[in-house]
């Protein structure tokens, strides 16, 4: 699993960003809070990563803090 990524912030969209790590661009889904705290484009950024694998997709979710990541894990574990 990927636990953390550090690279250059290449692109930012609504709910996502692309982090370039040594020439590989990772599409990472993020909260608006995480995006708002991100530095300007082409600056270094580190994110804690939660990998979500399903039959039909492979998603990376990025967080500024481990606490925010833990809350995400709680939310996705709730049944119903």
Which positions does each model-derived feature cover?
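Short coil-to-beta-strand transition motifs
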Residues: 1-5
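Conserved hydrophobic positions within beta-strands
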Residues: 7-9
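Long, highly charged, low-complexity intrinsically disordered interaction regions
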Residues: 11-80
């Amino acid at each position: 699993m990927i636990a953390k990524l550090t690279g250059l912030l290449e692109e930012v969209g609504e709910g996502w960003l692309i982090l370039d790590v040594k020439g590989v661009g990772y599409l990472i889904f993020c909260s608006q809070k995480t995006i708002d705290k991100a530095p300007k484009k082409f600056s270094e950024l580190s994110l804690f990563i939660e990998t979500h694998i399903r039959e039909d997709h492979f998603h990376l979710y990025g967080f500024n803090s481990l606490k925010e990541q833990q809350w995400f894990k709680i939310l996705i574990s709730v049944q119903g």
